[in-house]
Amino acid sequence: MHQVIQLKILDSRIGDTIPLPAYATDGSAGLDLRVCISEPMQVAPQQAVLLPTGIAIYIADPKLAAVILPRSGLGHKNGIVLGNLVGLIDSDYQGELKISCWNRSQEHFTVNPGDRIAQLVFIPVVQASFEVVNEFTESSRGEGGFGSSGRY
Protein backbone atom coordinates (compact mmCIF):
# COMPACT_ATOMS: atom_id res chain seq x y z
CA MET A 1 0.00 0.00 0.00
CA HIS A 2 1.32 3.45 -0.90
CA GLN A 3 -0.02 6.73 0.47
CA VAL A 4 1.20 10.28 -0.21
CA ILE A 5 1.53 12.32 3.00
CA GLN A 6 2.13 16.07 3.07
CA LEU A 7 5.45 17.00 4.71
CA LYS A 8 6.46 20.53 5.67
CA ILE A 9 10.14 21.36 6.20
CA LEU A 10 10.44 23.62 9.25
CA ASP A 11 14.24 23.81 9.35
CA SER A 12 16.35 24.50 6.25
CA ARG A 13 18.87 21.79 7.23
CA ILE A 14 16.25 19.14 6.45
CA GLY A 15 16.92 17.75 2.98
CA ASP A 16 20.35 19.41 3.01
CA THR A 17 22.66 18.35 5.86
CA ILE A 18 19.95 16.31 7.61
CA PRO A 19 18.19 13.80 5.33
CA LEU A 20 14.43 13.62 4.98
CA PRO A 21 12.73 10.71 6.76
CA ALA A 22 13.44 7.54 4.78
CA TYR A 23 13.02 3.79 4.92
CA ALA A 24 16.40 2.15 5.63
CA THR A 25 15.59 -0.96 3.56
CA ASP A 26 12.92 -2.08 1.09
CA GLY A 27 11.32 -4.13 3.87
CA SER A 28 11.34 -1.41 6.55
CA ALA A 29 7.97 -0.64 8.13
CA GLY A 30 9.19 2.62 9.69
CA LEU A 31 10.77 5.74 8.29
CA ASP A 32 13.83 6.86 10.26
CA LEU A 33 13.29 10.16 12.08
CA ARG A 34 16.38 12.28 12.61
CA VAL A 35 17.15 14.82 15.29
CA CYS A 36 17.31 18.42 14.07
CA ILE A 37 19.64 20.11 16.56
CA SER A 38 22.58 22.47 16.00
CA GLU A 39 25.19 20.78 18.18
CA PRO A 40 25.69 17.53 20.11
CA MET A 41 23.52 17.21 23.20
CA GLN A 42 24.14 15.17 26.34
CA VAL A 43 21.19 13.27 27.81
CA ALA A 44 21.95 12.44 31.43
CA PRO A 45 20.97 9.14 33.04
CA GLN A 46 17.22 9.05 33.76
CA GLN A 47 16.76 12.38 31.94
CA ALA A 48 13.99 12.90 29.37
CA VAL A 49 14.32 15.51 26.64
CA LEU A 50 12.07 16.63 23.80
CA LEU A 51 14.00 16.53 20.52
CA PRO A 52 12.91 18.44 17.40
CA THR A 53 12.78 16.78 13.98
CA GLY A 54 12.47 19.95 11.90
CA ILE A 55 9.45 18.55 10.04
CA ALA A 56 5.68 18.52 10.27
CA ILE A 57 3.33 16.13 8.51
CA TYR A 58 -0.36 16.35 7.66
CA ILE A 59 -1.95 12.96 7.12
CA ALA A 60 -5.44 14.39 6.35
CA ASP A 61 -7.11 10.97 5.93
CA PRO A 62 -8.97 10.08 9.16
CA LYS A 63 -8.54 6.41 8.30
CA LEU A 64 -4.77 6.80 8.90
CA ALA A 65 -2.57 7.82 11.81
CA ALA A 66 1.14 7.60 12.50
CA VAL A 67 3.07 6.38 15.51
CA ILE A 68 6.54 7.39 16.60
CA LEU A 69 8.31 4.29 17.87
CA PRO A 70 11.77 3.70 19.36
CA ARG A 71 14.59 2.19 17.35
CA SER A 72 15.29 -1.23 18.83
CA GLY A 73 19.08 -0.94 18.82
CA LEU A 74 19.09 2.29 20.82
CA GLY A 75 16.92 0.79 23.54
CA HIS A 76 18.77 -2.50 23.76
CA LYS A 77 22.35 -1.23 23.43
CA ASN A 78 22.11 2.24 24.98
CA GLY A 79 18.96 2.36 27.11
CA ILE A 80 17.48 5.10 24.93
CA VAL A 81 13.69 4.77 24.66
CA LEU A 82 10.75 7.08 24.10
CA GLY A 83 9.66 8.94 27.21
CA ASN A 84 6.02 8.54 26.22
CA LEU A 85 6.62 4.95 24.97
CA VAL A 86 4.68 5.62 21.73
CA GLY A 87 3.86 8.95 20.13
CA LEU A 88 0.50 9.00 18.36
CA ILE A 89 0.13 11.42 15.44
CA ASP A 90 -3.53 12.02 14.60
CA SER A 91 -4.57 12.62 10.99
CA ASP A 92 -5.48 16.27 11.69
CA TYR A 93 -2.26 17.20 13.56
CA GLN A 94 -0.05 19.66 11.66
CA GLY A 95 2.61 20.63 14.20
CA GLU A 96 6.27 19.69 14.36
CA LEU A 97 7.04 16.06 15.08
CA LYS A 98 9.04 15.89 18.29
CA ILE A 99 10.66 12.90 19.93
CA SER A 100 10.42 12.36 23.67
CA CYS A 101 13.80 10.77 24.37
CA TRP A 102 14.40 9.10 27.75
CA ASN A 103 17.80 7.82 28.82
CA ARG A 104 16.93 4.93 31.15
CA SER A 105 20.59 3.88 31.41
CA GLN A 106 23.17 4.85 34.02
CA GLU A 107 25.46 6.47 31.42
CA HIS A 108 25.33 9.82 29.64
CA PHE A 109 24.21 9.51 26.02
CA THR A 110 25.23 11.92 23.26
CA VAL A 111 22.67 12.85 20.61
CA ASN A 112 24.31 14.31 17.51
CA PRO A 113 22.68 16.47 14.83
CA GLY A 114 21.00 14.21 12.28
CA ASP A 115 21.06 11.06 14.45
CA ARG A 116 18.31 8.54 13.69
CA ILE A 117 16.60 8.42 17.06
CA ALA A 118 13.09 7.06 16.34
CA GLN A 119 10.94 5.73 13.54
CA LEU A 120 7.61 6.79 12.06
CA VAL A 121 5.08 4.10 11.12
CA PHE A 122 1.74 4.77 9.44
CA ILE A 123 -1.19 2.67 10.64
CA PRO A 124 -4.85 2.21 9.68
CA VAL A 125 -7.45 3.64 12.05
CA VAL A 126 -10.92 2.41 12.90
CA GLN A 127 -13.09 5.08 14.50
CA ALA A 128 -15.48 3.03 16.62
CA SER A 129 -18.86 3.83 18.07
CA PHE A 130 -20.21 2.10 21.16
CA GLU A 131 -23.34 0.08 21.74
CA VAL A 132 -24.17 0.19 25.45
CA VAL A 133 -25.24 -3.27 26.69
CA ASN A 134 -26.13 -4.81 30.04
CA GLU A 135 -24.38 -8.10 29.22
CA PHE A 136 -21.84 -9.18 26.61
CA THR A 137 -22.36 -12.05 24.24
CA GLU A 138 -20.52 -14.93 25.91
CA SER A 139 -16.98 -15.72 24.71
CA SER A 140 -14.65 -18.58 25.59
CA ARG A 141 -12.30 -16.17 27.39
CA GLY A 142 -14.82 -14.10 29.29
CA GLU A 143 -13.19 -11.71 31.76
CA GLY A 144 -9.91 -13.63 31.98
CA GLY A 145 -6.85 -11.43 31.57
CA PHE A 146 -3.26 -10.96 32.69
CA GLY A 147 -1.99 -14.44 31.87
CA SER A 148 -5.31 -16.28 31.86
CA SER A 149 -4.73 -17.69 28.35
CA GLY A 150 -1.50 -19.48 29.31
CA ARG A 151 1.88 -18.90 30.88
CA TYR A 152 3.87 -18.21 27.68
UniProtKB/Swiss-Prot annotation:
Query: What does it do?
Result: This enzyme is involved in nucleotide metabolism: it produces dUMP, the immediate precursor of thymidine nucleotides and it decreases the intracellular concentration of dUTP so that uracil cannot be incorporated into DNA.
Instruction: Name a single GO biological process.
Output: dUMP biosynthetic process
Broad enzyme group: hydrolase
Q: Which UniProt keywords apply?
A: Hydrolase, Magnesium, Metal-binding, Nucleotide metabolism
Q: PANTHER family, per this entry?
A: DEOXYURIDINE 5'-TRIPHOSPHATE NUCLEOTIDOHYDROLASE
Cofactor entry: Mg(2+)
The catalytic activity of this protein is classed by the Enzyme Commission as 3.6.1.23
Q: Which HAMAP family match?
A: dUTPase_bact
- Quote the record's binding site residues for substrate: 71-73, 84, 88-90, 98
**The species this protein was found in:** Legionella pneumophila (strain Corby)
The answer to keyword tRNA processing applying to this record is no
The record's annotation in NCBIfam families points to: dut, PRK00601.1
Protein name from the UniProt record:
Deoxyuridine 5'-triphosphate nucleotidohydrolase
Which CDD domains would you find in this protein's record? trimeric_dUTPase
Record's family? Answer: Belongs to the dUTPase family.
InterPro entries, alphabetized:
dUTPase, dUTPase-like, dUTPase-like_sf, dUTPase_trimeric
Transmembrane region(s): none
Reaction catalyzed: dUTP + H2O = dUMP + diphosphate + H(+)
Q: What would be an example GO MF term here?
A: dUTP diphosphatase activity
Q: Identify the pathway.
A: Pyrimidine metabolism; dUMP biosynthesis; dUMP from dCTP (dUTP route): step 2/2
